[in-house]
Amino acid sequence: MRYMLDTNICIYIIKGNPPQVLDRLKTLTQGSAVMSVVTYAELRAGLELQSANRAQDERALAFLTSRIPVLPFNESAAQCFGVMRAALRERNRNTMDRLIAAHAVSVGITLVTNNEADFKDYPGLVVENWAPSAAATAPSKVSKKAPARKPPTKV
């Protein structure tokens, strides 16, 4: 199975917290996890907006992209975006999230995110959460024991 990692999951990998995200990533074969160029753009923007630890953050992002390929956004992804935008036009949704969702659907892979609510009701999108307790738990209180893996859910 292949996975597209959302921005929050990439940040968890860079920070190494929560540990269950890294544990899950380690079970995959090389190339099974990818990120959208949209996620890469969000990570770059975050890096550009902050000044503390700039060199360290540059190295961390370079290391991440050396291990997790960045997929270009192509015509098929743009077509999926148009369909999703039309299907959910009355809902106020983040454009970057719509682009990431469309990208995952266009290549037929599961989107891994800790923001399941942000991706609810996207046509054809399959979502999986590798860090279900991360949003509700402070980093210092994250359990060392990884939770049971949730099966993918089609949303």
Language-model-detected regions and their locations in the chain:
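Short, well-structured N-terminal submotif of metal-dependent ribonuclease cores
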Residues: 1-35, 47-63, 133-139, 144-146, ...
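Alpha-helix/helix-capping structural signal
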Residues: 8-9, 38-41, 76, 117
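A general structural signal for well-ordered alpha-helical segments in protein cores
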Residues: 40, 58-61, 78, 97
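Generic structural signal for small/hydrophobic residues in well-ordered secondary structure
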Residues: 6-8, 21, 43, 81, ...
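Active-site neighborhoods of divalent-metal-dependent phosphate/nucleic-acid chemistry enzymes
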Residues: 68-114, 141-155
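Amphipathic alpha-helical segments within well-ordered protein domains
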Residues: 44, 62-65, 82
